[in-house]
Amino acid sequence: MWHLLPPSALLLLISSVTKAADPSKAVVLLDPPWVRVLTDDNVTLTCQGAYPPENNNTRWFHNGTHIVGSQAPSYLISGIKVENSGKYQCQTDLSPLSDSVQLQVHADWLVLQTSKWVFQKGESIRLRCHSWKNKRLYKVTYLQNGKPKKFFHNNSEFHIPEATVNHTGSYYCRGLIGHNNKSSGIVAITFQADFAGPSIAPLFPLWQQIAFCLMMGLLFAVDTGLYFFVRRDLRRSMVHKEEYNFKWSQAQDK
């Protein structure tokens, strides 16, 4: 019955079923969750994905190159260096290659840390003024576009509960390490207003989605088959009618 489907419809059906059957991509998580760190920090990357039973084999990639020798779900970078900067991805036996996570490593006294670069409307923003080797930092000021936004006598995170377009801009922090006044580099925080809606979990399990696609394909095939069957019989009827009319016309002429 599948041969009754037009090629374009068959390809569309196969594509929809394939997409429904594909598992979710793997996801790279950072611990601590900051995408900007200082040299000598410790960073753990964890691959969140689907694994077959008793097999947690994980493939890690740095700037598109496979990291040989790292097969565990967690990848620890101890005493991180500037050359460790770049894009990280992971893949499991049951999950496709993850989207990349951009990690920046800076050699400086201070770094303004953020968990991501682009925020959606209503999301919370966490900014952290981090010192090299966690040296004591006090009298910390967070600035947006050169203007002070928050001051802490003792170092603390700057938390924005709900992001809006007004929070777009260039941020940095400054504070005292000992008697020395230090400033971080600038971080550009951008805002995506209603560009993409929140992710919504599927209403039905995967097997029900696949069964639905197959059922719809079967119904479409039956409908298409009936269409061609009726059209063929209609053509035959028209031919017989024309032949009958022709013979009847000849009989009248005689």
Swiss-Prot record:
Recorded GO MF terms: IgE binding; IgE receptor activity; IgG binding; IgG receptor activity
Repeat recorded as keyword: yes
Residues of the site described as Important for receptor turnover: 223
Extracellular compartment spans: 21-209
All residue ranges annotated as the Ig-like C2-type domain in the record: 23-104, 121-174
Subcellular location per the Swiss-Prot or TrEMBL entry: Cell membrane
Transmembrane residue ranges: 210-230
Post-translational modification note: N-glycosylated.
Cysteines joined through disulfide linkages: 47-90, 129-173
UniProt GO BP: antibody-dependent cellular cytotoxicity; neutrophil activation; positive regulation of bone resorption
Parts of the chain on the Cytoplasmic side: 231-254
SMART domains: IG, IGc2
Signal peptide (residue range): 1-20
Assigned keywords, A-Z: Cell membrane, Disulfide bond, Glycoprotein, IgE-binding protein, IgG-binding protein, Immunity, Immunoglobulin domain, Membrane, Phosphoprotein, Receptor, Repeat, Signal, Transmembrane, Transmembrane helix
A Gene Ontology cellular-component term: cell surface
Membrane disposition: Single-pass type I membrane protein
Record note on quaternary structure: Forms a heterooligomeric complex with ITAM-containing signaling subunits FCER1G. Interacts (via transmembrane domain) with signaling subunits; this interaction is a prerequisite for receptor complex expression on the cell surface and intracellular signal transduction. Binds the Fc region of antigen-complexed IgG.
Role: Receptor for the invariable Fc fragment of immunoglobulin gamma (IgG). Binds with intermediate affinity to both IgG2a and IgG2b. Can bind to IgG2a and IgG2b monomers. Does not display binding to IgG1 or IgG3. Recognizes neutralizing virus-specific IgGs displayed on the cell surface of infected cells and triggers antibody-dependent cellular cytotoxicity (ADCC). Confers protection to lethal influenza virus infection.
Name of the protein described by the UniProt record: Low affinity immunoglobulin gamma Fc region receptor III-A
